[in-house]
């Protein structure tokens, strides 16, 4: 003990940073030297699931834990809190608890704040000081309520915003919050039912990465996206009713990851500039693929389709025809998990007459990978036959059999 206590305080603080916050605080009883060291930790994490070791489900244990945070968090002395994470699973906070802890973090120029409320959504981010925090760079909320005050707000440094299972005070809360973030670069929204939103408006000129996940039960109103600087777009949409995406021009978009059950092709008009496209959609259709003729993906280099049904090759073959510079094609076959959906394979023209070969087969396709190949499926065999017969530039091939 004497040897480690002889180390400089700065080094001891770095050592304490490797410990859970509650354990680091407990070292304050070791000696006078250790009494205040934990107060200079740059990162703090309070999580009742990890920290409550006795009587996890008891009201008294959670009350003791609340008191522990209320006592120790205000004692923190570092001028900047690099990150503060608050996670609650087994008890109910009072509104003033979370509000006071957030205000302490803001007063210490917090840079990253995470609030995770498992199983409950009665914790409101209503502290007015939070919405004017100049130091905040990252804000993450899970299962909380966003209550934006009517006063003038600004988050001038916020670059990352993650909102999962969040409930909003009203229809304007999210729009107002986004309008306070002039330099926001990454936005992730995961929607579930009862979030008090109908449509969704994302109007953030500075945004570079956008991730939208919508589950069954969410409203089916339109999504409006105005993000001219966007580089990456993810849309996972499992809503039961048909909805549309209205997207302003995104000329800098380079990568898209799409999993939409209905009309995913409607988005293709926005993807003319992308280099990487991942598609997890229902390919099964006896009709012609539904995106507009004349759309060409001149910059697309990597294509990853996830296959659920028969007749997947119809849309894929058209995408290949419209992607003259494609270098990497990786097919992930998950049909075995969707046997109830699989329809009858209807051979398309290329399986009968291979005279029309995609340009990328002749000039650019270098890598071809298949995960879970079904040798008993005629459609799979037809497509592989086409690839190996005409893809002249292949350098790498990988096929995993189911």
UniProtKB/Swiss-Prot annotation:
Family annotation (Pfam families): F-box, FBD, LRR_At5g56370
FBD domain segment(s): 349-401
Residues annotated as domain F-box: 1-47
UniProt name for this protein: Putative FBD-associated F-box protein At5g56690
């Amino acid at each position: 003990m004497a040897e480690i206590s002889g180390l400089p305080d700065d080094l001891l603080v770095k050592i304490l940073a490797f410990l859970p916050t509650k354990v680091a605080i407990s070292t304050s009883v070791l000696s006078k030297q250790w009494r205040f060291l934990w107060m200079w930790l740059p990162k703090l994490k309070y999580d009742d699931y990890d920290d409550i070791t006795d009587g996890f489900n008891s009201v008294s244990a959670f009350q003791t834990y609340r008191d522990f945070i209320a006592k120790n968090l205000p004692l923190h002395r570092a001028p900047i809190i690099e990150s503060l994470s608050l996670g609650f699973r087994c008890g109910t906070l009072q509104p003033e608890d979370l509000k006071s802890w957030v205000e302490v973090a803001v007063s210490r120029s917090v840079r990253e704040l995470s609030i995770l409320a498992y199983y409950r959504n009665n914790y409101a981010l209503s502290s007015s000081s939070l919405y004017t925090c100049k130091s905040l760079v990252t804000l993450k909320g899970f299962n909380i309520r966003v209550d934006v005050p009517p006063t003038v707000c600004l988050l001038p440094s916020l670059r990352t915003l993650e909102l999962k299972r969040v409930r909003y005070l009203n229809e304007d809360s999210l729009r107002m919050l986004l309008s306070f973030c002039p330099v926001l670069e990454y936005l992730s929204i995961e929607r579930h039912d009862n979030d008090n939103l109908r449509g969704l408006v994302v109007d953030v000129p500075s945004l570079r990465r956008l991730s939208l996940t919508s589950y069954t039960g969410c409203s089916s109103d339109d999504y409006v996206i105005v993000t001219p600087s966007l580089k990456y777009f993810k849309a996972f949409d499992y809503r039961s009713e048909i909805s549309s995406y209205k997207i302003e021009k995104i000329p800098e978009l380079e990568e898209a990851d799409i999993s939409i059950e209905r009309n995913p092709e409607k988005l293709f008009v926005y993807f003319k500039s992308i280099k990487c496209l991942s598609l997890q959609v229902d390919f099964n259709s006896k009709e012609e693929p539904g995106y507009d003729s004349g759309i060409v993906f001149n910059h697309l280099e990597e294509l990853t389709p996830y296959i659920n049904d028969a007749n997947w090759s119809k849309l894929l073959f058209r995408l290949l025809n419209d992607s003259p510079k494609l270098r990497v094609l990786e097919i992930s076959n998950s049909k075995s998990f969707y046997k109830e959906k699989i329809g009858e394979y209807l051979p398309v023209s290329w399986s009968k007459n291979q005279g029309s070969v995609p340009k990328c087969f002749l000039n650019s396709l270098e890598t071809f990978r298949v995960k879970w190949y079904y040798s008993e499926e005629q459609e799979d065999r037809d497509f592989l036959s086409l690839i190996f017969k005409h893809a002249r530039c292949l350098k790498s091939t990988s096929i995993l059999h189911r």
